[in-house]
Amino acid sequence: MTRSLKKNPFVANHLLRKIEKLNTKAEKEIIITWSRASTIIPTMIGHTIAIHNGREHLPVYITDRMVGHKLGEFAPTINFRGHAKNDNKSRR
């Protein structure tokens, strides 16, 4: 179910403050965050945000095509290694 249009998109306050501070200074530096639920808004375009995936922070460069998506969509938490090639024990 999608978020109601009456509500604004969720962006963590600490993340929003960091981005606004960098926009006023016109600086570009990596912003580290644990907030995977924050929605990407147009003021984030051009910044690099390091998103936590449970183990490390993955740097993601924000482009205009990412607006409206959540930050967590761009930092996968599980690495699928593929199915077992020859698993005869589980067949028994």
Curated annotation (Swiss-Prot):
One of its GO terms (cellular component) is chloroplast. It holds the Pfam family Ribosomal_S19. The keyword Chloroplast applies. One of its GO terms (biological process) is ribosomal small subunit assembly. It is found in: Plastid, Chloroplast. One of its GO terms (molecular function) is structural constituent of ribosome. Its main location: plastid. It comes from the Eukaryota. Gene3D superfamilies: 30s Ribosomal Protein S19, Chain A. Keywords: Chloroplast, Plastid, Ribonucleoprotein, Ribosomal protein, RNA-binding, rRNA-binding. Protein S19 forms a complex with S13 that binds strongly to the 16S ribosomal RNA. NCBIfam families: rpsS_bact. Belongs to the universal ribosomal protein uS19 family. This is Small ribosomal subunit protein uS19c.
